[in-house]
Amino acid sequence: MTIEPRATADLVDDIGPDVRSCDLQLRQFGGRPEFAGRVTTVRCFQDNALLKSVLSEPGDGGVLVIDGDGSLHTALVGDVIAALGRDNGWSGLIINGAVRDASTLRTLDIGIKALGTNPRKSTKTGAGERDVPVEFGGVTFTPGDVAYSDDDGIVIVTP
């Protein structure tokens, strides 16, 4: 089921003061600046094997929220993994961590928000957790929530 993007400012106006918006100032890296979808989560630290495995599955228009504990030491997503997500139907990635291949990411039809960049590769041991609540930017991302993202920020809605 595809969830259409909506302007996050309009969502905030509609929801009011109890809105769940991410306070973390993530940068826009993907070629799709507005995206929305059901949340799937991964928690991993400087290791991207688990998130690559998840992005290998059909995304059905979902958003993968990746909590890399804010580390900018290694990139969790680069052009190959982002293209894998795009090819498997994910609408976007929200990353509490770093990406690489930034100039190529801008050309891919997938939304990507992250803290910053680092050309260093991550490890690939498969360490991490999937489908668990993750928290960053003052908001908890729970699997099954709906994430809306645009140039103004990220809003999370529980259906």
From Swiss-Prot:
**Enzyme Commission designation:** 4.1.3.17, 4.1.1.112
**Record note on quaternary structure:** Homotrimer.
UniProt xrefs under Gene3D superfamilies: Ribonuclease E inhibitor RraA/RraA-like
Q: What is the protein named?
A: Putative 4-hydroxy-4-methyl-2-oxoglutarate aldolase
Task performed by this protein:
Catalyzes the aldol cleavage of 4-hydroxy-4-methyl-2-oxoglutarate (HMG) into 2 molecules of pyruvate. Also contains a secondary oxaloacetate (OAA) decarboxylase activity due to the common pyruvate enolate transition state formed following C-C bond cleavage in the retro-aldol and decarboxylation reactions.
Query: What family is reported?
Result: Belongs to the class II aldolase/RraA-like family.
Segments passing through the bilayer:
none
- Residues reported in the UniProt entry to bind a divalent metal cation: 101
Tell me its cofactors: a divalent metal cation
**Pfam families in UniProt:** RraA-like (PF03737)
Reactions this protein catalyses = 4-hydroxy-4-methyl-2-oxoglutarate = 2 pyruvate; oxaloacetate + H(+) = pyruvate + CO2
Any one Gene Ontology molecular-function term assigned to this protein's record: metal ion binding
Please list the GO biological process terms of this entry.
regulation of RNA metabolic process
Domain of life, per lineage: Bacteria
> Which sites bind substrate?
78-81, 100
Give the cofactor note: Divalent metal cation.
Assigned keywords, A-Z: Lyase, Metal-binding
